[in-house]
Amino acid sequence: MANEMEFEKPILELKSKIADLKEYNETSDVDLTNEIEKLEKRLGKLESSIYSNMTAWDKFQVARHPERPTTLDYISLLFEDFMELHGDRAFGDDAAIVGGIATFKGVPVTVIGHQRGKDTKDNLHRNFGMPHPEGFRKALRLMKQADKFGRPIICFIDTKGAYPGRAAEERGQSEAIARNLYEMSDMKVPIISIVIGEGGSGGALALGVGNQIFMLENAVFSVISPEGAAAILWKDASQAKKAAESMRITAGDLFELGITDGIIPEVKGGAHRDLNAQAEEINKTITKSLHALMAFSEEQLIEQRYEKFKKIGVYDTL
């Protein structure tokens, strides 16, 4: 099957065997029903064993799966009356970041997220989900608008990182990211950030200064990709698997380190297996988080966000 991952090979081989037996059973006089049922039970156990013991590298592969749901996929299922807004009012519109206004269970909100492409043409249009400065500035424009009108902000994070090209640097890539961090820290409305795939470095942080941060179970969040870390540490990008295991990039790691506030369960095998079921899990998390944060005053939201990020990286105090 296309787009299947290395660690899933035993599952795919058993599924193929079951499919062959079912096809043979339909045209043969021999009844193989019992054998098929036994193999299906074995398949269920095998899937549970493999998917419940995934390594950091396995999860990294799932986070980058080409069929993994994107921001727009979730927006279509989670929000009503979504109206996309375009442009940073300074240079142009960046398709690597989408955003606009919508309602969530009757509550007016602003939704912003990285957007990867679905195929080669779409990925070129979206720059593979790697924003230029105008993408971050568009996001900030929408956040300031939300802050002005008292709309909670919901961010979906899914990027390898900010685009490192020359044009992006000339237009102030680092300043655009830093400006978002600075401005988000002082927003008077609730901010919820959810890592739905890959949370790569500053490109992810530019949408990540939230009152609460959540990660999907198989999402990853790191300052550099495992391939990049391996190239720096061992001068060998093929050591990416080794790097992934030592970098603590998984949802479990980030929650244990106190960087995120919760883990959103994924359907067995990854979010791409059942978009509707995965959207429902995200729905539950947003509902609970929004209910809690909307009880805070403006001053409490700013203070809570400040205290949250001040504690990150603190291991001991005098």
UniProtKB/Swiss-Prot annotation:
Function as written in the Swiss-Prot or TrEMBL entry: Component of the acetyl coenzyme A carboxylase (ACC) complex. First, biotin carboxylase catalyzes the carboxylation of biotin on its carrier protein (BCCP) and then the CO(2) group is transferred by the carboxyltransferase to acetyl-CoA to form malonyl-CoA.
Q: PROSITE patterns, alphabetically?
A: COA_CT_CTER
Q: Name one GO cellular component term.
A: acetyl-CoA carboxylase complex
Question: Part of which pathway?
Answer: Lipid metabolism; malonyl-CoA biosynthesis; malonyl-CoA from acetyl-CoA: step 1/1
- Xref: Pfam families: ACCA (PF03255)
Q: Which GO biological process categories is it annotated with?
A: fatty acid biosynthetic process; malonyl-CoA biosynthetic process
Identification of the protein by name: Acetyl-coenzyme A carboxylase carboxyl transferase subunit alpha
Record-annotated CoA carboxyltransferase C-terminal domain positions: 31-292
Tell me its EC number(s), please.
2.1.3.15
- Name the family: Belongs to the AccA family.
Task: Write the gene name.
Answer: accA
Q: What class of enzyme is it?
A: transferase
Q: Which organism is it from?
A: Listeria monocytogenes serotype 4a (strain HCC23)
Localization annotation: Cytoplasm
Q: Which InterPro entries match?
A: Acetyl_CoA_COase_a_su (IPR001095), ClpP/crotonase-like_dom_sf (IPR029045), COA_CT_C (IPR011763)
Q: How does it assemble?
A: Acetyl-CoA carboxylase is a heterohexamer composed of biotin carboxyl carrier protein (AccB), biotin carboxylase (AccC) and two subunits each of ACCase subunit alpha (AccA) and ACCase subunit beta (AccD).
What's its catalytic activity?
Answer: N(6)-carboxybiotinyl-L-lysyl-[protein] + acetyl-CoA = N(6)-biotinyl-L-lysyl-[protein] + malonyl-CoA
Could you tell me the keywords of this UniProt record?
ATP-binding, Cytoplasm, Fatty acid biosynthesis, Fatty acid metabolism, Lipid biosynthesis, Lipid metabolism, Nucleotide-binding, Transferase
Q: Which domain of life is it from?
A: Bacteria
Q: What are the protein's GO molecular function terms?
A: acetyl-CoA carboxylase activity; ATP binding; carboxyl- or carbamoyltransferase activity
